[in-house]
């Protein structure tokens, strides 16, 4: 596989590049360490932000219904919220943003098992955070604890996803920037968990969605800013492992489309949070009326016995 995007005048008489048993020309160090996070222009950051907002919006709708549900129904809504926020709002946003990532002179390939594992991790940690808030309440301690656990998990998802990249060069990270990205992730997760427990109307939901989309995107690009690429021993091995972006794009589009349609169907067909709350109030009122009727009937029953 020949490196892409290099002009002939960049070639240098350096040690050869080896790929799948073939000897290829070598290139200058500068051409191989140029990282471009926006190789496709503003398409990927805007699209990834919109997808993040969409996932967070559906997720907030699910968590709102979890608040007014009980038992298995509440757990089910929390699970759907975790899939929406962790899957679409965070992981899909990360992957789509990575479509614009390119190191000049190399081809980006993905380790499929690690890529899938990063998505499952995102869903799991968001689900854990939502469960903590749902069961323990939105106190300062639980909010900080849930936000920290979820933020660390999201950061782990990001760097696991980066570990899944095969780029043919040595990748290192600027430690202070890594810590900054983790901090951003914790703040974003804490804000998201707080919003998941507090959003009650459409206007607040729109604002919360935008805040969460900005926070998730900010964490991703802060983490990407920590990345450094270096040539190993003066040569570059063109990556042969993993699969290409094009090979993953089709399954990703199909998977996201199907899951989004299913989520929207569930959310659309199920009662809204307001309707569920009204049902709970009606059940409470009905129970009180039955109790009043029983109390009113008790004197008559006693008189009949006498």
Predicted regions and their residues:
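Peripheral, non-catalytic segments of secretory and membrane proteins
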Residues: 2-10, 18-306
């Amino acid at each position: 596989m020949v490196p892409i995007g290099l002009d002939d005048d960049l070639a240098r008489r350096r040690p050869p590049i080896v790929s799948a048993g073939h000897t290829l020309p070598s290139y200058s160090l500068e051409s191989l360490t140029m990282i471009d996070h926006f190789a496709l222009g503003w398409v990927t950051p805007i699209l990834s932000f919109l997808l993040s907002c969409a996932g967070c919006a559906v997720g907030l709708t699910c968590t709102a219904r979890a608040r007014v549900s009980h038992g298995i129904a509440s757990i089910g809504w929390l699970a759907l919220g975790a899939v929406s926020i962790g899957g679409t709002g965070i992981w899909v946003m990360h992957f789509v943003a990575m479509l614009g990532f390119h190191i000049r002179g190399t081809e980006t390939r993905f380790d499929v098992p690690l890529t899938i594992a990063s998505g499952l991790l995102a869903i799991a940690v968001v689900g854990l955070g939502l469960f903590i808030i749902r069961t323990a309440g939105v106190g300062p301690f639980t909010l900080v604890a849930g936000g920290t656990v979820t933020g660390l998990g999201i950061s782990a998802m990001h760097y696991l996803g980066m570990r899944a990249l095969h780029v043919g060069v040595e990748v290192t990270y600027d430690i202070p920037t890594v810590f900054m990205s983790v901090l951003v992730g914790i703040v974003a997760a804490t804000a998201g968990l707080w919003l998941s427990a507090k959003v009650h109307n459409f206007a607040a939901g729109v604002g919360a969605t935008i805040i969460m989309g900005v926070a998730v995107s900010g964490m991703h690009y802060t983490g990407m800013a920590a990345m450094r690429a270096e040539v190993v021993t003066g040569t570059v091995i063109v990556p042969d492992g993993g699969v290409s972006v094009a090979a993953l794009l089709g399954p990703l589009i199909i998977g996201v489309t199907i899951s989004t349609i299913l989520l929207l169907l569930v959310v659309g067909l199920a009662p809204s949070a307001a309707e569920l709350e009204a049902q709970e109030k009606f059940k409470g009122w009905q129970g009180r009326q039955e109790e009043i009727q029983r109390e009113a009937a008790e004197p008559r029953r006693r008189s009949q016995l006498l």
